[in-house]
């Protein structure tokens, strides 16, 4: 089941949980970046409009987490 998260700090706490298995980073055409975090029960989604914040968040994800880049289609 999907859940939308609006707070970056809460998203990072969820990413550091033990049941977080993977994350996907999706870039939209309108410059928004979606972070999708797969946990055991929910798929958490965070939408970041600022590219600099998105890059900092991408670097702040735990190294044990599998991160997949999903770009826009050419």
From Swiss-Prot:
Alphabetical list of Pfam families matching this protein: Ribosomal_L38e (PF01781)
GO cellular component annotations, sorted alphabetically? Answer: cytosol; cytosolic large ribosomal subunit
Q: Tell me the Gene Ontology biological-process terms attached to this UniProt entry.
A: cytoplasmic translation; protein-RNA complex assembly
InterPro entries noted in UniProt: Ribosomal_eL38 (IPR002675), Ribosomal_eL38_sf (IPR038464)
Q: Which UniProt keywords apply?
A: Cytoplasm, Ribonucleoprotein, Ribosomal protein
Which Gene3D superfamilies does the UniProt record give? 3.30.720.90
Report the locations given in the UniProt record. Answer: Cytoplasm
Which is one GO molecular function term here?
structural constituent of ribosome
Task: Reproduce the miscellaneous comment text.
Answer: There are 2 genes for eL38 in S.pombe.
* Quaternary structure (record): Component of the large ribosomal subunit (LSU). Mature yeast ribosomes consist of a small (40S) and a large (60S) subunit. The 40S small subunit contains 1 molecule of ribosomal RNA (18S rRNA) and at least 33 different proteins. The large 60S subunit contains 3 rRNA molecules (25S, 5.8S and 5S rRNA) and at least 46 different proteins.
What family does this belong to?
A: Belongs to the eukaryotic ribosomal protein eL38 family.
Record's function text:
Component of the ribosome, a large ribonucleoprotein complex responsible for the synthesis of proteins in the cell. The small ribosomal subunit (SSU) binds messenger RNAs (mRNAs) and translates the encoded message by selecting cognate aminoacyl-transfer RNA (tRNA) molecules. The large subunit (LSU) contains the ribosomal catalytic site termed the peptidyl transferase center (PTC), which catalyzes the formation of peptide bonds, thereby polymerizing the amino acids delivered by tRNAs into a polypeptide chain.
Name under which the protein is recorded: Large ribosomal subunit protein eL38B
Organism of derivation: Schizosaccharomyces pombe (strain 972 / ATCC 24843) (Fission yeast)
């Amino acid at each position: 089941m999907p859940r939308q998260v609006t707070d970056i700090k809460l998203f990072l706490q969820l990413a550091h949980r033990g049941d977080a298995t993977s994350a996907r980073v999706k870039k939209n055409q309108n410059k928004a970046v979606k972070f999708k975090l797969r946990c055991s029960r929910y798929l958490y989604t965070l939408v970041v409009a600022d590219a600099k914040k998105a890059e900092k968040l991408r670097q702040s994800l735990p190294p044990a987490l599998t991160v997949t880049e999903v770009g826009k289609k050419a």
